[in-house]
Amino acid sequence: IIKLYEDNGFKLYNRITIWKEPLRVRTRTMVQSLMHKFIVEDSTKCFTAMPDYVLIFKRNGDNEVPVTHNSGLTKYYGDTPILPAMVGIFNRANETNFDAVQLWDYLKNTYADHKDTKSNKLSHYIWQRYASSVWDDIRIDNVLPFRDSKEEDDEKHVHPLQLDVIDRLVDLYSNPNEVVLTPFMGVGSEVYS
């Protein structure tokens, strides 16, 4: 994929790894290499849960229409907006005693309509999560409905993209009301989002 894009004038700009929880992957896909019984019987049959990757390409040159976030990032798409380390840092800096839920509620209530991007702590905390090279906060079940593989002969390649990934990328890389190209339809997640 990377070579194909590079051969057509694009440069790989970023790669994001989307972590997958092994038990949920096993349950959804029925892949045998994630079964615990093979650790006992023959661990050479075992493999890790494969992550998803988002590859971001850009062409050289100036972007004629900058993607702007005039108030910073205001919506978080994912499961865990505040990491434990973030809570401790915030509490020490502000002499508070919030837990993760209280801190997130405080940030949303205090900064949701905040216009100064430099002091908008909500935007800064969202960006800390998004700026990670591994997105471990994507809700694996936040997908459009599809039929799970249950029988041995079922198709095992149905992997709808999580809506958090789509929403996050559209928010990061497009302006409001822009038309976004989706090169494949799949189960329709991009169009739905």
Regions found by a protein language model. Name each.
Residues 1-193:
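Core catalytic lobe of class I
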